């Protein structure tokens, strides 16, 4: 009988320990879960911050490349009227051959310098394209001249890579 009492006491103590252990593991699991959630939160914040930094660097690189690519835009816009004036001067009657030759050389050197910077003349023959041409006058279309074709160029247009610096001013058959 003494043995039975000891066995019962041992069983009760073991049951109490099991209950206490079960109660203790639940808070430990919740603390572990909380710690894991916080770790996941920090990892998520880190990944977002890292992605944001990469986006900032990418945008800065793109902006730097665009600045480099279009650096001569303002200078070209300032030079184009002078180039137009040279063309008008060459069209004047009564100039000596030496003067025409000199003006032609200056014009060629300016055009060459602009081409080196990526500035090109916009083609102003054939069909009218509102992206590159500005219609300043219209003429009636006929059998020889279909609708939306360019009749005459008043002022040449220029572009820098894919940007329009100045559209070509043209007369269009309508």
UniProtKB/Swiss-Prot annotation:
One of its GO terms (biological process) is protein folding. Its main location: cytoplasm. Keywords: Chaperone, Cytoplasm, Stress response. One of its GO terms (cellular component) is cytoplasm. It is found in: Cytoplasm. InterPro entries: GrpE, GrpE_coiled_coil, GrpE_head. Residues 9-25 have a biased composition (Acidic residues). Residues 1-35 are annotated as: Disordered. It comes from the Bacteria. Residues 26-35 have a biased composition (Basic and acidic residues). One of its GO terms (molecular function) is protein-folding chaperone binding. Pfam families: GrpE. NCBIfam families: PRK14140.1 (NF010738), PRK14156.1 (NF010753), PRK14162.1 (NF010759). Participates actively in the response to hyperosmotic and heat shock by preventing the aggregation of stress-denatured proteins, in association with DnaK and GrpE. It is the nucleotide exchange factor for DnaK and may function as a thermosensor. Unfolded proteins bind initially to DnaJ; upon interaction with the DnaJ-bound protein, DnaK hydrolyzes its bound ATP, resulting in the formation of a stable complex. GrpE releases ADP from DnaK; ATP binding to DnaK triggers the release of the substrate protein, thus completing the reaction cycle. Homodimer. Belongs to the GrpE family. This is Protein GrpE. It comes from Streptococcus pneumoniae (strain Hungary19A-6). The lineage of its organism: Bacteria, Bacillati, Bacillota, Bacilli, Lactobacillales. The gene is grpE.
